[in-house]
Amino acid sequence: MSTAPSKTFPDGSPDVPLLEIQGISCNYGLERAVYDLSLTVNKGEQVCLLGPSGCGKTTVLRAVAGFQPLLSGRISINGQSVSQPGEILSPEKRRVGMVFQDHALFPHLSVEQNVGSGLRTLSAVERRATVSEILERVGLMRVAQRFPHELSGGQQQRVALARALAPRPLLLLMDEPFSSLDLDLRERLGQEVADMLKANAITSILVTHDQNDAFAMGDKIGVMAEGRLLQWDTAYN
């Protein structure tokens, strides 16, 4: 498999979809996991892929992130091809942020150090300014000096979100980020995150098996089953 040439991704243009998935098929191990799936996400949209475990939704997310090769089809970000059979742009060059159920914070680093851990190319002054801005945005400034073990589950997930947003990605990918939280906290945090993403026009894809999460956060919802996209529409259509 060849690596695609280096590309520069400017901020998303309003004239092209931020993400375009065209007829992709993928395997999970030796088994086919995704069949001929197509969808488009515009700049500033929050969309969800909803379906049971094993339906292929996480495989789609991994393909968008650059961790999953394609058997067929094409993925484009901001009008530029990033994946097709035999060619894949590496994840770190895609301007994509990721938040997973296992937020995997560095236990020996403070909140602000965790958030700044992916900003090594910035100067110290620029890094501090960026971290402060992101922590303010997600409501974590007052715990900036604390360590992960001193935080609640909801706070830890906010740190993971802040860390994903710090490099200013074009697209935020979230894989079941709230499923380990209790119901009340999951609903509250999900709504807070949805409000923050909308207020800042951040384009995102949420993968979930929970219909409540999908309807709380999705401008559009894609329903998946057995590797196929069965429905793709606005949340209440």
Describe each region flagged by the PLM.
Residues 229-233:
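ABC ATPase "signature
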Residues 147-151, 155-157:
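Conserved ABC ATPase signature
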Residues 82-97, 121-129:
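ABC ATPase NBD coupling module
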Residues 80-83, 125-143, 195-201:
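Conserved ABC ATPase "signature" region
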Residues 166-170:
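A short, proline-enriched helix->beta-strand linker immediately N-terminal to the Walker B motif
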Residues 109-118:
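Short coil-to-helix segment of the ABC ATPase nucleotide-binding domain corresponding to the Q-loop/switch region
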Residues 172-176:
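Catalytic Walker B motif of ABC-type/P-loop ATPase nucleotide-binding domains
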